[in-house]
């Protein structure tokens, strides 16, 4: 990244290559307002593009931000014909991932085969976060099939997004184990599985796992390509949000996921009218100074505390002006 890049998101708004934009942050920092207003702005500035906002945050504040009820299917935002929103509960998507059934085996890229792996070895289920990561991969697969030009995720800064990036490594290890088991014990395991009521077929299991691995590797390849994917952390100038943002940035760097822009929200004006305001602003000033030092090579967008609630398309559109170049 270059030193002192412009303090706006024009490089994201006008990008002709970006397909995935993640907006994440600690609760209460304005993450959903950011993702929704950015979605409106990109749709407005690029009428030829189909834009989709997906909320994977359990709170699902996107409905509140637009003042429109959204659900698990994409719904067009009135007044913004090329922008749709959907809210997906990752926990709901996780249901059945490890159930011993064939539900979804043919429709979700082969992820239903986990039931077979669970019955065979009982290993995957014990891996922390694996069900969440695989459920998120199903959501990504679903989004790909919808043929939107750009997808914005309103998501928590940690959890399924980052866990998913390590999924191919885990699946590759599991595939190697399956191949070894197949070579050594395939016929015996199939016979034993039949006796125990487990539907295990090594000849079907291996290609299904290979397909699942290939699918997850392709998605991770997209997510680690800065021309296709970027992550925008949102914070407020306080200790915990800054600490969590720095931890997130380091983790994204380790996973080779691009992050070149940061939104700093809810900045108080300089105000000497009361001790509380003065002290609060002094605390913010300290952390704003640290943010400038830490992220001087990022597109750093600083936004003042809003005097009115940002709710509805008109308010989101007005808020989105914070992301544009100042003329």
UniProtKB/Swiss-Prot annotation:
<dbReference type="Pfam" id="PF02374">
    <property type="entry name" value="ArsA_ATPase"/>
</dbReference>
<keyword id="KW-0479">Metal-binding</keyword>
<protein>
    <recommendedName>
        <fullName>ATPase ASNA1 homolog</fullName>
        <ecNumber>3.6.-.-</ecNumber>
    </recommendedName>
</protein>
<keyword id="KW-0862">Zinc</keyword>
<comment type="similarity">
    <text>Belongs to the arsA ATPase family.</text>
</comment>
<feature type="binding site">
    <location>
        <position position="238"/>
    </location>
    <ligand>
        <name>ATP</name>
    </ligand>
</feature>
<comment type="function">
    <text>ATPase required for the post-translational delivery of tail-anchored (TA) proteins to the endoplasmic reticulum. Recognizes and selectively binds the transmembrane domain of TA proteins in the cytosol. This complex then targets to the endoplasmic reticulum by membrane-bound receptors, where the tail-anchored protein is released for insertion. This process is regulated by ATP binding and hydrolysis. ATP binding drives the homodimer towards the closed dimer state, facilitating recognition of newly synthesized TA membrane proteins. ATP hydrolysis is required for insertion.</text>
</comment>
<feature type="binding site">
    <location>
        <position position="274"/>
    </location>
    <ligand>
        <name>Zn(2+)</name>
    </ligand>
</feature>
<dbReference type="InterPro" id="IPR027542">
    <property type="entry name" value="ATPase_ArsA/GET3_euk"/>
</dbReference>
<keyword id="KW-0547">Nucleotide-binding</keyword>
<dbReference type="InterPro" id="IPR025723">
    <property type="entry name" value="Anion-transp_ATPase-like_dom"/>
</dbReference>
<keyword id="KW-0963">Cytoplasm</keyword>
<keyword id="KW-0256">Endoplasmic reticulum</keyword>
<feature type="binding site">
    <location>
        <position position="277"/>
    </location>
    <ligand>
        <name>Zn(2+)</name>
    </ligand>
</feature>
<dbReference type="GO" id="GO:0005524">
    <property type="term" value="F:ATP binding"/>
</dbReference>
<feature type="binding site">
    <location>
        <position position="265"/>
    </location>
    <ligand>
        <name>ATP</name>
    </ligand>
</feature>
<dbReference type="InterPro" id="IPR016300">
    <property type="entry name" value="ATPase_ArsA/GET3"/>
</dbReference>
<dbReference type="GO" id="GO:0016887">
    <property type="term" value="F:ATP hydrolysis activity"/>
</dbReference>
<dbReference type="GO" id="GO:0046872">
    <property type="term" value="F:metal ion binding"/>
</dbReference>
<dbReference type="InterPro" id="IPR027417">
    <property type="entry name" value="P-loop_NTPase"/>
</dbReference>
<feature type="active site">
    <location>
        <position position="57"/>
    </location>
</feature>
<keyword id="KW-0378">Hydrolase</keyword>
<keyword id="KW-0067">ATP-binding</keyword>
<feature type="binding site">
    <location>
        <begin position="26"/>
        <end position="33"/>
    </location>
    <ligand>
        <name>ATP</name>
    </ligand>
</feature>
<dbReference type="GO" id="GO:0071816">
    <property type="term" value="P:tail-anchored membrane protein insertion into ER membrane"/>
</dbReference>
<dbReference type="GO" id="GO:0043529">
    <property type="term" value="C:GET complex"/>
</dbReference>
<keyword id="KW-0813">Transport</keyword>
<comment type="subunit">
    <text>Homodimer.</text>
</comment>
């Amino acid at each position: 990244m270059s030193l002192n890049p412009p303090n706006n998101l024009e490089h994201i708004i006008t990008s002709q290559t970006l397909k995935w934009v993640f907006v994440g942050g600690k609760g209460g920092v304005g993450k959903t307002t950011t993702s929704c207003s950015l979605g409106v702005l990109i749709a407005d500035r690029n009428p030829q593009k189909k834009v989709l906002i997906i909320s994977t945050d359990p709170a699902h504040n996107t409905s509140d931000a637009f003042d429109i009820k959204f659900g698990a299917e994409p719904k067009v935002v009135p007044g913004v014909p090329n922008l749709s929103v959907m809210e997906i509960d990752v926990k709901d998507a996780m249901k059945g991932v490890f159930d011993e059934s064939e539900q979804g085996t043919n429709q979700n890229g082969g992820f239903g085969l986990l039931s077979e792996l669970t019955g065979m070895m009982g290993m995957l289920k014990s891996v922390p976060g694996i069900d969440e990561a695989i459920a998120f991969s199903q959501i990504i697969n679903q989004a790909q099939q919808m043929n939107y030009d750009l997808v914005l995720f309103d998501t928590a800064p940690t959890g399924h997004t980052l866990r998913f990036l390590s999924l191919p490594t885990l699946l590759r290890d599991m595939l190697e184990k399956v191949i070894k088991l197949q070579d050594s014990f395939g016929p015996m395991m199939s016979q034993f599985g039949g006796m125990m009521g487990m539907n295990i077929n090594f000849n079907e299991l291996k290609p299904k796992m290979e397909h699942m691995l290939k699918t997850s590797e392709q998605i991770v390849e997209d997510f680690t390509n800065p021309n296709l994917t970027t992550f925008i952390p949102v914070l407020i100038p306080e200790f915990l949000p800054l600490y969590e943002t720095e931890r997130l940035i380091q983790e994204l760097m380790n996973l080779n996921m691009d992050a070149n822009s940061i939104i700093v929200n809810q900045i108080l004006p300089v105000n000497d009218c009361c001790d509380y305001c003065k002290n609060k602003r002094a605390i913010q000033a300290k952390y704003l100074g640290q943010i400038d030092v830490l992220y001087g090579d990022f597109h750093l967008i600083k936004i003042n505390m809003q005097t009115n609630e940002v709710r509805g398309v008109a308010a989101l559109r007005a808020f989105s002006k914070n992301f544009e170049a100042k003329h």
